[in-house]
């Protein structure tokens, strides 16, 4: 079964490349990345683009994993597909992001200048050391992150019916942006199975891949019995 993976703000498909080998043979990891996201005025426009690009690929059995910004994108994509009557993911793994009825984790991003935002990303573990060492790469990463976080701010939280597919919310025990109680708020967004998985670490707890896979693999193994 395919696992479509949606990266964090400022991230890209490379985040999930190591997952391919780790989750074989039962799961095909498909990283999702939309280039030039600055061309989208709102998150709704980005969701439209992702839905159009993935439409044929999502006809078969599939799952979503989204981290931070990617969790919101994955959730809104599932909502869009529910409205149009398209197949939903067999399950969704939503990581390090609060549901849309709560404030976005970095809703005050425009109160931070580029240096402050870069420092915050580094402190959170979201900026690799090889990028920090190169000012041009660092500046590009900060700019892309700001674009994605601004898209989060455009999310239109209309009344949304609970989705008919399981949701498993993941988070770090020491995440300064998203609390365990925030993650439990996803319960209202599904009419099916729900769980919260708290792993050791901060906002980027998933950098500890052995720990993540030890928790994720048993959940993946049960997805075949789920029906959405």
Regions from the PLM with identified roles:
Residues 176-182:
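Conserved alpha/beta-hydrolase "acid-adjacent" motif
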Residues 34, 79, 90-103, 124-125:
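Active-site nucleophile loop of the alpha/beta-hydrolase fold
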Residues 66-70, 74:
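Gly/Ala-rich beta-loop-alpha elbow adjacent to hydrolase catalytic centers
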Residues 1-61, 100-117, 199-204, 223:
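Active-site catalytic motif of lipid deacylating hydrolases and related acyltransferases
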Residues 188-204:
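Catalytic histidine neighborhood in serine/cysteine hydrolases
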Residues 169-171, 175:
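Short beta-strand/loop motif that positions the catalytic acidic residue
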Residues 206-222:
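Post-His helix in hydrolase/transferase enzymes
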Residues 142-160:
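Active-site nucleophile elbow and catalytic-triad environment of alpha/beta-hydrolase enzymes
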